[in-house]
């Protein structure tokens, strides 16, 4: 799992309190987070699924997921999270669920995250969360070879998105404050 331990504790609490029967995560990477979400649902007694969307799901990630005890709770879609064909597949899958949480953790550029916010925020159900991860990129300048960084990051995208959508979501800063070290400052949003 490529996350901060403090965030993982908060994620568990959010799943326990909101009880989503579907967690959508954009960005699969090595598959650890997808398995984490499925394991937390099961631990909380939630009969649910985790939908992972990634432009390039590597074989080692697929193997990790299919070798896990949670393979039956996980469904993967390969393709760009903002492509119409992929969005239609997500819409079809979402229609089977009532309580939906979204975790955005794929391409971290401002434009991509803003597109994801505009698309995936519509899937989040009342009182469930939209987590925008790696907003901390905006506060750091440690990888200048990337297409993202200060000013073009998940945080800059969230700030722009919330100008027009603040009536739909409320920032749950108490989680950020409790996490202390978080990859998602300004990234915990609950649908109201």
Name the predicted role of every residue range.
Residues 2-192:
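S-adenosylmethionine/decaboxylated-SAM
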């Amino acid at each position: 799992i490529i996350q901060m331990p403090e965030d993982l504790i908060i994620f568990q609490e959010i799943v326990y309190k909101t009880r989503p029967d579907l967690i959508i995560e954009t960005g699969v990477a090595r598959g650890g987070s997808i398995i984490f979400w499925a394991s937390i649902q099961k631990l909380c007694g939630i009969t649910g699924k985790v939908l992972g969307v990634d432009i390039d799901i590597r074989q080692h990630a697929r193997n990790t997921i299919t070798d896990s005890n949670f393979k039956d709770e996980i469904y993967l879609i390969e393709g760009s999270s903002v492509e119409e064909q992929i969005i239609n597949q997500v819409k079809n899958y979402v229609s089977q669920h009532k309580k939906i949480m979204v975790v955005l953790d794929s391409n971290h550029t401002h434009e991509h995250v803003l597109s994801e916010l505009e698309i995936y925020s519509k899937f989040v159900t009342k009182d469930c969360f939209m987590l925008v991860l790696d907003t901390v990129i905006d506060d750091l300048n440690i990888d200048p070879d990337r297409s993202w960084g200060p000013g073009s990051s998940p945080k800059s995208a969230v700030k722009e998105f919330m100008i027009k959508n603040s009536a739909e979501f409320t920032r749950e800063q108490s989680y950020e404050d409790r996490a202390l070290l978080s990859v998602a400052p300004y990234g915990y949003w609950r649908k109201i």
